[in-house]
Amino acid sequence: MRSINLANVSFLEARDHYVFISTVHGAVYKVRDSMTNQSRVFEQYGFLRVHKSFAVNMKHIEAIYTTEIICAGRSIPIGRSYKKDVQPAFLAYVGGQ
């Protein structure tokens, strides 16, 4: 088991029964789990589920557009079913800091 500094985690991506945890330094860690489980764990640390395959660290959001988020320099798609929750959640996060 490896310890990861959550402040450095930029986003989570689910692929093929694994969740890939990407950091701002370019490191990627692979965990065999579902995005549902991992996003619930990370949610309490300021992560937001934005797509069936992605959750982002709101600390690293650079821009929010209609269909994508720029997070730590990477374009992350916003899923249709998550779209209505993204902006209010981000504004609440920024307002709570």
Question: What kind of region is each of these model predictions?
Answer:
Residues M1, N8, H25, I70-R74, ...:
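Eukaryotic intrinsically disordered, low-complexity regulatory linkers and tails enriched in Ser/Thr/Pro
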Residues M1-C71:
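Conserved binding/recognition cores within well-folded domains
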